[in-house]
């Protein structure tokens, strides 16, 4: 594999596809001309360009160290026109699409004395590579998986026999004890979560008294945008808009007819990063470094807001 260029996109072809259950699809991708794809670390995801105006992020499931290919898995929502339903239709064996280089806002901490992985449903996908890496490094770890009916467990592959993995199947009356896990974890343990919003809120409540540097999570959906209203000025067009509580800059601009590239709406992918000309941003993303935020040069308009009455953007 090759080093990452964050600005690259790659044409990939579907070389295999399998249904782990009625609603869970696993797809393997290789570069269309069979050139090496970028290497990636546990927790990484790629943007998949489902259509020209529809981009979605999917975690990379490690296939094996010997393969220069990517695996993703997703749960199909049976809503007509949903992104996952379109993915299911378009990503058939032989089909091609474009993906971004891998990005990682959910990285394992190499200094963690112990790692606790907690996931719900299809949130297992980033955890598989994490667990494989921890096994290989012989570092202490455990994984706790909540699943409605166990469909996602096939993604574990050879990890399925590991004693470090606990399964909680809700259809059998099991419930993942997030608070107990957080309370029992040593103070220097790092906790990772990926799963649905309800479980995320339970995880955040259970870990609120822990060192924030040891608490890591990925969201399935964007959190509500809260805060005082402010004005956004567009330097190039001279347009001016008010962003109210509950709205994002991205939403306001799109509703006004501006085409702004975006994808995750959670402040993790970087596609909506915009140059800031003036004003004080309220950075709420999980992508920019502390020094990048302090510089005030750019902001992610899908989630970040303003600490000043006005912002002027290079748009």
From Swiss-Prot:
Record InterPro entries: 2Fe-2S_ferredoxin-like_sf, 2Fe-2S_ferredoxin-type, 2Fe2S_fd_BS, Benzoxazolinone_Detox_Enz, Beta-grasp_dom_sf, Cbr1-like_FAD-bd_dom, FAD-bd_FR_type, FNR_nucleotide-bd
Assigned keywords, A-Z: 2Fe-2S, Aromatic hydrocarbons catabolism, Electron transport, Flavoprotein, FMN, Iron, Iron-sulfur, Metal-binding, NAD, Oxidoreductase, Transport
Binding-site positions, FMN: 1-103
Keyword Cell membrane: no
One GO biological process term: catabolic process
Top-level EC class: oxidoreductase
EC identifiers of the protein: 1.14.-.-
Names of required cofactors: FMN
N-terminal signal peptide: none
Pfam families registered for this protein in UniProt: FAD_binding_6, Fer2
Residues that hold [2Fe-2S] cluster according to the record: 264, 269, 272, 302
Sequence intervals crossing the membrane: none
Domain of life: Bacteria
MF terms in GO: 2 iron, 2 sulfur cluster binding; metal ion binding; oxidoreductase activity
Gene3D superfamilies, per database record: 3.10.20.30, Nucleotide-binding domain of ferredoxin-NADP reductase (FNR) module (3.40.50.80), Translation factors (2.40.30.10)
Entry keyword Oxidoreductase: yes
Sequence ranges assigned to domain 2Fe-2S ferredoxin-type in this UniProt record: 228-315
Boundaries of every FAD-binding FR-type domain copy: 7-109
Assembly mode: This dioxygenase system consists of two proteins: phthalate oxygenase and phthalate oxygenase reductase.
Family membership: Belongs to the PDR/VanB family.
Name of the protein in question: 3-chlorobenzoate-3,4-dioxygenase reductase subunit
Organism whose genome encodes this protein: Comamonas testosteroni (Pseudomonas testosteroni)
């Amino acid at each position: 594999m090759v080093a990452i260029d964050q600005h690259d996109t790659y044409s990939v072809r579907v070389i295999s596809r399998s249904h782990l259950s009625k609603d869970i699809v696993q797809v393997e991708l290789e570069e269309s001309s069979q050139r090496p794809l970028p290497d990636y670390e546990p927790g990484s995801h790629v943007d998949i360009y489902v259509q020209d105006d529809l981009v979605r992020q999917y975690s990379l499931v490690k296939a094996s160290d010997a393969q220069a290919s990517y695996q993703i898995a997703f749960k199909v929502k049976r809503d007509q026109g949903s992104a996952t339903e379109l993915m299911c239709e378009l990503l058939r064996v032989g089909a091609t699409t474009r993906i971004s280089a891998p990005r990682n806002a959910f990285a394992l901490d190499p200094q963690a004395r112990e790692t606790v992985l907690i996931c719900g449903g299809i949130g297992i996908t980033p955890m598989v590579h994490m667990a494989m890496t921890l096994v290989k490094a012989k570092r202490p770890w455990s994984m706790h998986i909540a699943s409605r009916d166990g469909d996602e467990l096939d993604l574990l592959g050879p990890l399925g026999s590991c004693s470090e993995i606990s399964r909680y199947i809700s259809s059998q009356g099991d419930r993942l004890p997030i608070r107990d896990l957080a309370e029992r974890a040593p103070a220097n343990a790092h906790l990772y979560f990926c799963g649905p919003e309800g479980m995320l809120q339970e995880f955040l409540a259970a870990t609120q008294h822990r060192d924030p540097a040891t608490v890591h999570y990925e969201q399935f959906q964007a959190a509500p945008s809260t805060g005082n209203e402010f004005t956004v000025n567009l330097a190039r067009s001279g347009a001016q808009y008010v962003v109210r509580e509950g709205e994002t800059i991205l939403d306001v601009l799109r509703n006004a007819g501006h085409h702004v590239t975006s994808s995750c709406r959670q402040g993790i992918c970087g596609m909506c990063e915009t140059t800031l000309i003036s004003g004080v941003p309220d950075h709420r993303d999980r992508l920019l470094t502390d020094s990048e935020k302090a510089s005030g040069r750019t902001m992610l308009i899908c989630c970040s807001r303003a600490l000043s009455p006005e912002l002027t953007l290079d748009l």
